[in-house]
């Protein structure tokens, strides 16, 4: 791990020395105000999960938990200044959200709405077990500096890194606080390095609700040409885990504007003794390891896109991500919908079909995606090594193409999920019918 960090630092230093390979981003800065941009995203979100065969983890007895739903409205603000002119440019940014629930939301959950401290099922006062918040606000500021083609940003940020990715699939995003350096000194090469010390999940008002001690990230992505790129990223989260990610993506152009896209991606994770996992089959908590990889092929022609994918786990624990302040969306793998198909030793296969109605000449902005994923050979400690799960997924999204409501979108998705009896424990998803409805209205301020 230390060698990987040293290599990243060496690449950054070398890149700075030879930065004349391309025009400097900083030399083209127009100014603090001139390059500024700001927007507000008004979002109405609804998530409903009907747990048709949920098993409570503490008692092992079946408990029917129906109409677990959350309904709320938010305004997500994103303001980012330009850089001052000069050899080194400086700027500031603000990200945040203000939200309120719609209705009582007595069965709120699904990481949508914060909850007060209340009594859990055993009558013990527990954070997040009480009533849902009526309204809440979160966010923070950040500062940034740029030299040549290298930018350093410190403060509250929404991250999009394969090993540390903010959850953006709920009402509001997950925020990390720390420092991220991004460098483009060498043409077609992006190098990143960073350190983060706070993690605020989507349904938390505490700026460090996930109690992150220290997470160091590093990595690089290189574009060989218009069709081939590869990347590597690493994460070292103190007392929690060490994770590595690799990806190779190749697009093969075909006749008649068609194409085949091949993708390989994978993670290796070693959990520290202090990490939380729920799918391990070993009693040695200091020796929990997981390898997960996936390959996919997608064929695109006109309005049609068909993808097939295969995903496989190995080790003595599943890919238990998101529970150790390692990002609620740190799963850049194809078989991820309601379920991620990341069980211990699990194998899964998927077929997906997408249709762009605009390219059919029917209704520009309308897209439909449907998929079926089947997982097998899941190990459940002291129970079985052949559990199964399956999911049938559908999503329709419409984006307004022009006029005063341009870029506003409505997204409706449904998942029909079922698992074998051995995979119904409360640590897992359990048989679920899920609906998600999101209405997004972006407003550009400047």
Q: Language model features by range: what are they?
A:
Residues 22-38, 80-90, 133, 188, ...:
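Short loop/turn motifs that connect adjacent beta-strands in outer-membrane beta-barrel proteins
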Residues 30-31, 44, 81-83, 144-147, ...:
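Residue-level signature of outer-membrane beta-barrel architecture
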Residues 166-173, 199, 210-212, 235-245, ...:
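Solvent-exposed loop/turn segments connecting transmembrane beta-strands
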Residues 79-122, 126-204, 220-224, 228, ...:
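Outer membrane beta-barrel
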Residues 1-33, 428, 443-446:
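Cleavable N-terminal export/targeting peptides
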Residues 192-209, 236, 257-340, 344, ...:
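Outer-membrane beta-barrel translocator/channel fold
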Residues 218, 351, 431-446:
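Outer-membrane beta-barrel "beta-signal"
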Residues 152-166, 191-198, 218-220, 226-238, ...:
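Transmembrane beta-strand segments that form the barrel wall of outer-membrane beta-barrel proteins
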């Amino acid at each position: 791990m230390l060698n990987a960090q040293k290599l990243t630092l060496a690449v950054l230093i070398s890149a700075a020395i030879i930065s004349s390979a391309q025009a400097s981003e900083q030399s083209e800065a127009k100014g603090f105000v001139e390059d500024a941009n700001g927007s507000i995203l008004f979002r109405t979100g609804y998530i409903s999960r009907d747990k048709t065969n949920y098993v409570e983890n503490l008692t092992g007895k079946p408990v029917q938990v129906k109409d677990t739903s959350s309904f709320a409205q938010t305004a997500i603000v994103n303001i980012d200044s330009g850089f001052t002119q000069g050899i080194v440019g400086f700027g500031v940014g603000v990200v945040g959200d203000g939200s309120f629930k719609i209705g009582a939301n007595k069965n709120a959950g699904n990481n949508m709405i914060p909850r007060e401290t209340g009594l859990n099922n055993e009558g013990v006062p527990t954070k997040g077990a009480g009533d849902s918040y009526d309204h809440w606000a979160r966010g923070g500021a950040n500062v940034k500096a740029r030299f040549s083609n290298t930018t350093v940003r410190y403060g509250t940020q929404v991250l999009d890194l394969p090993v540390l990715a903010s959850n953006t699939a709920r009402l509001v995003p997950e925020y990390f606080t720390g420092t991220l350096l991004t460098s483009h000194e060498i043409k077609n090469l992006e190098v990143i390095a960073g350190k983060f010390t706070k993690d605020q999940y989507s349904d938390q008002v505490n700026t460090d609700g996930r109690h992150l001690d220290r997470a160091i990230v590093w990595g690089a992505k290189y574009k060989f040409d218009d069709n081939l790129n590869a990347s590597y990223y690493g994460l070292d989260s103190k007392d929690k885990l060490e994770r590595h990610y690799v990806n190779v993506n190749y697009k093969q152009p075909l006749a008649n504007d068609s194409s085949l896209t091949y993708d390989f991606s994978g993670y290796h994770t070693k959990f520290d003794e202090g990490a939380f996992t729920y799918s391990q089959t070993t009693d040695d908590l200091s020796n929990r390891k997981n390898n997960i990889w996936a390959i996919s092929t997608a064929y695109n022609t006109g309005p049609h896109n068909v993808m097939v994918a295969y995903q496989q786990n190995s080790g003595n624990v599943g890919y238990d991500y998101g529970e150790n302040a390692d990002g609620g969306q740190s799963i850049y793998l194809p078989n991820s919908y309601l379920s991620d198909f990341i069980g211990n030793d699990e194998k899964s296969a998927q077929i997906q079909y997408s249709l762009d109605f605009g390219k059919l000449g029917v209704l520009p902005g309308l897209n439909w995606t449907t998929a079926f994923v089947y997982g097998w050979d899941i190990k459940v400690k002291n129970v079985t090594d052949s559990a199964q799960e399956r999911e049938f997924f559908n999503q329709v999204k419409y984006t307004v193409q022009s006029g005063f409501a341009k870029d506003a979108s409505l997204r409706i998705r449904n998942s029909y999920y079922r698992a074998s009896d051995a995979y119904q424990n409360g640590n897992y998803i359990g048989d679920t019918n899920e609906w998600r409805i999101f209405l997004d209205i972006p407003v550009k301020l400047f």
